[in-house]
Amino acid sequence: VIERYTLPEMGNLWSEAYKLKTWLQVEIAVCEAQAELGYIPSEAVAKIKAKANFDPKRVLEIEAEVRHDMIAFLTNVNEYVGDAGRYIHLGLTSSDVLDTALALQLIASLDLLLQRLEDLIQAIRHKAREHRYTVMIGRSHGIHAEPMTFGFKLAGWLAEVLRHQERLQILQKTIAVGKISGAVGTYANIEPRVEVIACQKLGLKPDTASTQVISRDIHGDYVQQLALVAASIERFAVEIRNLQKTDVLEVEEFFAKGQKGSSAMPHKRNPIRSERLTGIARLVRSHASAVLENVALWHERDMSHSSVERVVLPDACILTHFMIHEITDLVTNLLVYPQNMERNLNCYGGVVFSQRVLLTLIDKGLNREEAYAIVQQSAHTAWNKPEGNFRDLISKDPRVTQKLSPPEIDACFDPQYHLRHLDQVYQRLGI
C-alpha cells in the first residue's frame, strides 16, 4: 500500500523487518520445544537465543543469489549464530515457518484493528447520544419516507460496528493457528509434540490437520471479515456524501481552516474523505475475491497463493485500519445541521405524514382503498406543486373533515408520534 493510506503502527507490522522477526520467533520456539523434548542440546538453544539476528538487506542480497527467501533468511541467521545454527530449522519445511509466522502477523494486525474499532464504537455512541432527538426525514429509495432522528440512524451504524467487533474477536481465535508438521504435514521428520509446545510458546494452537500449508479457507475468512468492515464503512461514508449534497446539507464533513475544496471553484466544500473511503472499500473487496482464489491449491500445496498474499494480506489490513481511523475522525467531527433537517422534513407541507393520515382515516371507519385514494390525491397534488402543502389540502378535503376534527388532523402531523419507541432501540444498544 502507498504511504498515503498507511498508518505507522499497522505499516510496521507488515514491514520486512517485522516479518523476519516473526520468522525468527518461530524458529526459536521450535528449537526450545526440541530441547525440552531432548532432541537438541539446551546449550545450543541458549547460544541461538543469545546470538540469533538478521539483517534485512543482507537477506535480500542472499536471496538474489539463491532465489529462495527462507534459505536466504536461514543463511543470514547462521552468519550470526555460528555452529549452533545447525539446529535451526531441523525437520522443518519453509511453510512451517511462513504460515506460523503469518498467523502472528495477522493476530497482531487484528489487535490493532480491534483497538481502532473500539474508538469508532465510542465515537458513534457519543454522536448517537448527542442527536438522540434530532428529528430528520427518513428516506427509502432516496425519496422522503417518514420522520426519524439522526441519532436513530447512528444507532443502526453502532449495531453494525458491534457485529463487526464480535466477528473480529471470533477471528482472533480462528486465525491463531500454527503448523510445525514438515513436508506434506505428516510429521515424518519432526515430533508432533514439538508442534504442540512451539505453538503454545507462540500463543497459537496446532492446526488440526494441515497439509504442507495451513488451509487457505482460514485466510479467506480473515480477509472477507475485513471486507465486511470496509463495506460498512463505505455505507457510512456514502450516507455522509448523500446528506452533504448542496440541496440536502443535513450533515457535512468538518472543513478545516485553510482547507481548499477545488482548484477552480473557491466555494466548494467537497466530502473528499468520504469519497476516499468509498474508493478504498473497493480495493478491500477486491482482495476478498483474491484470497478465495487461494483456497484451491494443488494437492498438499503449491505456491500460487504466495504472490497473492504478499500483496493482499498487508493491503487488506493496512487499508481497513486506515478506513476505521478515518471514519472515526469523520464521525467525531461531523457537522450536523438540525435546522436543515427540519426544513427538509417539512417540505411539501408535511407530505411525509401521509401514512399517519391514512391509518387514522381507516381507524375512523373508511376502508383502506378509499382512504388510500383520498390521501394519495392530496399527497401527489402537494408533491407536484412548488408551493404544495399537504396539510392544507387534507384540512380542506371534506372527505377528511367529515371523519377527523382539526385536533385529530393536527395530531397526524406530530413527528413525536414516530419517535415514541426509539428509546427501546437505545436501551438495546446501551446508549
Short names for language-model regions:
Residues E195-Q212, R216:
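Active-site-adjacent "gating/activation" loops or surface patches in catalytic cores
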Residues V30-A33, L113, L117-L120, I124-K127, ...:
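Amphipathic alpha-helices that form helix-helix packing interfaces
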Residues V1-T22, I62-V66, D83, M265-I431:
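Glycine-rich cofactor/substrate-binding loops
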Residues E32, Q105-L117, L226-R235, I240, ...:
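Alpha-helical support elements that line or immediately flank enzyme active sites
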Residues V1-Y187, E191-I197, P206, Q259-S262, ...:
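A helix-coil-helix interface module used to build multimeric assemblies
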Residues F152, G220-L228, R356-K364:
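Short, well-ordered beta-strand elements within core beta-sheets of diverse protein domains
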Residues I40, V248-L249, N367:
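Conserved hydrophobic residue
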Residues H164, V213-H305, R310:
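Glycine-rich anion/phosphate-binding loop at the beta-strand->alpha-helix junction
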